[in-house]
């Protein structure tokens, strides 16, 4: 007979595994192909290419999480970022494959390669609102909603966002 404690343990383990199970199959498309397949991410893709990050990061071994702004969101970003500013772009990329469930399990915090933190500050479980923060500080500056999460690639995951995160 199963005890209540055993049922909770099994349920918790199942939820944990579900958050980790969203991995692209071996040989699936790489991040740049996933980003390139969505015409609504073409401006972001062009900036990754012009900055050199597309080849520097995504054409080499490594797993990444990308917060990819839509073309509309990208058009509202500062010109330096739209033109391929590496620091601004690195603030949209994190190391590791972080599904939405993984982000939520980490308390809604992600450290980006550019050194900023991104935190969940509201929204819903399916479409959280995120905001940038300088390390050790409260979130500030622009925020964005994740409008399509967990787009898996062989070398990471893409979350499509309606904004470009810039801490103030």
Regions found by a protein language model. Give the residues of each.
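Mature, structured domains of secreted/extracytosolic soluble proteins
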Residues: 2, 8, 20-168
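Sec-dependent signal peptide hydrophobic core
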Residues: 11-12
